[in-house]
Amino acid sequence: MVLSANDKTNVKTVFTKITGHAEDYGAETLERMFITYPPTKTYFPHFDLHHGSAQIKAHGKKVVGALIEAVNHIDDIAGALSKLSDLHAQKLRVDPVNFKLLGQCFLVVVAIHHPSVLTPEVHASLDKFLCAVGNVLTAKYR
């Protein structure tokens, strides 16, 4: 999915609001995903999945950190997330649909915390970005 210059600007603007909250927003995104889509929990049998869990916070921080990395390399998301793509495709074997579910939950978290920023246009840009990230993370499944 091709991001326009306007999309890139919108995404970068949203992430200026998110960067300082990586752990909290990431944990909230994961908790929301696990509750809304219970089958996603199967990839985390060793995690304490309760609200406020240190494991959820740590992994949430990694998730948002990867998104921040993608934003920082928005013109080469595939290069920025290549190792992460390998990990998810070859070692973890995460069902590709889960990236879409995670993206949806992340959008909800952004909307909750920054409703004035998430205009319809920005929402569309962020959705395109999250789809692009998902496409990169699933590219090596083929």
Curated annotation (Swiss-Prot):
The keyword Ribonucleoprotein does not apply. It comes from the Eukaryota. Signal peptide: none annotated. One of its GO terms (cellular component) is blood microparticle. O2 binds at residue 59. One of its GO terms (biological process) is hydrogen peroxide catabolic process. Red blood cells. Residues 2-142 form the Globin domain. Keywords: Heme, Iron, Metal-binding, Oxygen transport, Transport. GO terms for molecular function: haptoglobin binding; heme binding; iron ion binding; organic acid binding; oxygen binding; oxygen carrier activity; peroxidase activity. Heme b binds at residue 88. InterPro entries: Globin (IPR000971), Globin-like_sf (IPR009050), Globin/Proto (IPR012292), Hemoglobin_a-typ (IPR002338), Hemoglobin_oxygen_transport (IPR050056), Hemoglobin_pi (IPR002339). Belongs to the globin family. Involved in oxygen transport from the lung to the various peripheral tissues. Heterotetramer of two alpha chains and two beta chains. This is Hemoglobin subunit alpha-A.
